Structures are given as structure tokens and as C-alpha cells.
Amino acid sequence: MDLITVREVRTPSTRAELRFAPGELPLGGGTWLFSEPQPGLTGLVDLTTLGWRPLEVGDDVVTVAATCTIAELTRLPARDDWAAHPLVAQCANSLLASFKVWNVATVGGNVATSLPAGALTSLLAGLDATAVVWTPDGGERREPVARLVTGVRTNTLTTGEVLRSFEVPTASLRSRAGFRRVALSPLGRSGALVTSRLSPDGEFVVTITAGTTRPEQLRFDEVPGAAALAGAVARVGTWYDDPHGAPDWRRHVSALFAEELRTEALLPQQPPPAAPFVHRPGPLGSATADAAARTAVPAPVAPGPGAAAAPPAPAPAPAPAPDPEGGAA
């Protein structure tokens, strides 16, 4: 959508240039900003020109820049001990966006928009990520993502503050994780998204999103009993009501998912299955690349020494001779 009131787009290259005049907003990927009218918006400040590295992997934290795109996030390399790594693809695919959106939409934008179905909020809250916020006075503050989002399109960011990055503890990535999601239609907006995390020290955390107006975290020192978990879910009072799901339905499926994840955490740990992941081609890739990859026939493999060769394919049957009357013989 054209934002006809915008008069200027500024492209800062340093933090000193990152200032907001009245009527200006920060611009990341713009996938939400350009999706509807923005009354009173007179200028944009493009954060992507600041040159922040999308991903930085350290010993204790993985730093995700606010301008990191969804596509870049899904390319975060897994490590052998990162049992929770499949959550990245699972949550990213919950957005059900086209590859065009994946290549421009940013992690910071998804969190700052603060919609209940913001799947990257689900991911970061579930992994106990901390948001690093730049303040107008040149300082910064930190706040857990689970507390940054306070409601439907509301958060703790104040005028002039900018999301700089998210710090994901590698300890969370080493935790055993679970994931459940439901929508009213196969390709619908998330009605409820529940993740679990069992830390090496035994702490069990259930994070409920999409079905609630803000992330709801249920923490236990160890995997709780069924009644304790059900009681904790019942005490949640922020169930969301919109055309994508009624509050009582969201409460019911979230409780069901939480119990499934609790039971799953008590089972012996298995190697994590490959995360359901839909490859998103780059900006210049073909929109049909996914379909082509799924339907491609693998090349035949030559038999090894001593192996019996596969029998040749039968020759095609000869075409029927034409019938003089115009039919087939």
C-alpha cells in the first residue's frame, strides 16, 4: 500500500543519526507497515542501513539483530548439542508467509508489531530471549521478550526507543524442546502455539502464545504432575478472541498441548526429528523452485561392485494402429 503521507525516508549509518522527528517511524522490512494506512506518518527511518550483522554466535548467547530477516534466521547453523534448534524452523513456518515476505520481514518487526500470532515472538519467548533496546539518550536497556509484549499490538517500547537485537541463551538451545500449533484451517493464522523446554537442570517451561494476547510462561522446577500443569493453564486469563478462534477453544487446545508436551518430556529423549521446513528461495529465485524440488526425480544410482543390476525398464508398447473409421484399433 502506498503511504501517501510520507515525505522523507532517512537512511542512518551511525547511531548518532538514529533520531526520530515527530511523525517518523523506524522501518525494518516494512511488510506490516506497508500493509495498511498509517495516519499521521510523515517519515521513515530505515534501520537496515545501519549494517547490523544478522546473527552472531557466541559461547553463551546467540545474538539476533532486529533487522535479521526470517530467511536469515532460518539459516542459523545447528550445533550437535542444540536440541531446541528445530523450534527455529517450526516457528518460522508458522507464519505461513511467502518467500518474498521471508526475504524482507525482520525479526524485530515481528516482535515490535506485537500481534498474538507473531511466531517469532513465540520462538524468542519460548527460548527465554532478552531484547536489547536502544534508548533515545544513547543508552540501552534489556527486557525479556516474554515481558516486552504486553498485549495486542502493545509493548513496553516508548517513543524514540529502537529494538537493537535479541540475545538467545545457548543454554536454552541445549534444552529439550517441544512444539504444538493449531489453526482453524490448514493454512490459517495460528489459533494456539505452545512450546515447552526442559533444561538440563530439570526446569520445565511451557510458553503459550497465539491463543493469548501476550506470551504466557508457566515455570516449574521440574516436570510437574498433570493436575499442577492443568491448574496453571486454567489460571491464565489472557485468552484472545478474534475470528481465528474463540477463547474457550484456545484455552482447551492450549491445555491439551501443554499436557502432551508434559508427557513427552517424561519419555526418554530421542534424536530430534528433522523440522518441517519449506525452503524459501532467495529474492531472485523462482516461485516454483519449492514445487520443482519436491517433485524432482532423483538420478539413478549405479550399483556397487558385486551388486545385481536392476532389470531394464520394459520397452513401451507400440502405439495402436489407426482405425479407418476414425477410432482406435
Predicted region positions:
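C-terminal structural segment of proteins
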Residues: 1-306, 314-329
